[in-house]
Design a protein with these regions (language model features):
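Pre-Walker A-like glycine/lysine-rich segment at the N-terminus of P-loop NTPase domains
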Residues: 1-42
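Phosphate-coordinating catalytic segments in nucleotide- and nucleic-acid-processing enzymes
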Residues: 47-178
Length: 178
């Protein structure tokens, strides 16, 4: 995995250079950019996935300021972009660079051996389970909350009869009464 994210002057993040391992844990005070970095990572992993699946061309994301108006706007972080913002993500299959107001994508020409599913779980996650059938309330939340809500409903259906976890003989079961 060992993907790398470099961020300068983006929202609360002044200067960051992080290498993502199989498990990466963010610890810090509130408002220091943990969620911002998680949203960027999730966004780049999603973009890498759809590009590798040929659902979009590289040029789609590079044109018309879509980095800001589509990708960042999805997580409501478009206002975090400043004139001097610099963001570089070195993924497994693509490199992404935002610099001087321009966004570019470079393909690495590597074999695809499976792309993991990464999703940012929004802070509004607790509202999703309570407001599952209240579509008007959910529409006021960020788009990432709607995606999380859809995945939450699918997971409940999938795990309805339980799931054996891959360690210590543990089993997960969802009980809607708890």
């Amino acid at each position: 995995m060992n993907e790398r994210l470099i961020v300068k002057s983006f929202g609360p993040v002044n200067d960051l250079d992080i290498i993502f391992k199989k498990v990466t844990l963010f610890i810090g005070d509130q408002g220091t950019g943990k969620s911002c970095v998680a949203k960027l990572f999730s966004m780049f992993k999603w973009t890498e996935k759809v590009l590798s699946q040929k659902k979009y061309k590289l040029s789609y994301f590079e044109q018309y300021n879509r980095f800001k108006t589509k990708l960042c706007a999805y997580h409501r972080i478009e206002s975090f972009i400043y004139e001097n913002s610099y963001i570089k993500f070195e993924g497994n299959l693509y490199d992404f660079l935002y610099e001087n107001g321009n966004f570019s994508v470079t393909e690495k020409n590597r074999d695809i051996k499976g792309i993991s599913k990464v999703m940012y779980v929004p802070a509004e996650r607790s509202i999703v389970s309570v407001a599952e059938n209240k579509s008007k309330l959910l529409k006021e939340l960020p788009d990432s909350s709607e995606t999380f809500s859809d995945e939450f409903v699918n997971a409940k259906k999938f795990f309805q009869s339980g799931y054996n976890l891959p360690f210590e003989g543990l089993r997960f079961e969802y009980d809607s009464l708890n």
